[in-house]
Amino acid sequence: MSNVNPVTEKSVSWHGLYILADRALLPTRIETEQGDFDVEPIRQFDYRSRLALIEALAAAFMTGNPEAEVPPIENKKKPTPMEKLVGAKSWTDLERKSIYFSIMVYPSTVRLESWARASDGTWSDEKETALDITIPLSAGVEGVADTILEHLRTRRDLPGVTFDFPQPKTAKGA
């Protein structure tokens, strides 16, 4: 969608969107001296609703990635907040139950990435993206949401889901 190279710009914020069969999770991503972490609060919403997706993305973009202390080391041995919400047995189980979007916001663009499936049902490695697109920031949160929804219509690899988004009625068959 854009030929702007986000590599030349420093990111403004980075967000992870987890699409599940029945909902989406958009955790708060904090910035620490040891890297970024997904933490609570976690927005849960119906991703099939364009308005709900736009509202969740807009709130995340406004919040950005707050600076925070590194989560306690003992948390590494515990399930992540996303695993708990989903009832996943492990991170691998969470990956098998979800489609993940990395959303990098830059001053002039937004880069969206989503990974294909590996043979074991988890997300493929970083070189095997099912989506890797740069959207001009001028497209707004609406453009980002629309790109996510368009991509989800092409995916057939989320357990328990058939993507059947509401379609406008036409004179034929209405």
Predicted regions: what is each one?
Residues 1-15, 97-101, 154-174:
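Intrinsic N-terminal pre-sequences and regulatory tails
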Residues 44-66, 130-166:
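Ampiphathic alpha-helical segments that act as solvent-exposed interaction surfaces
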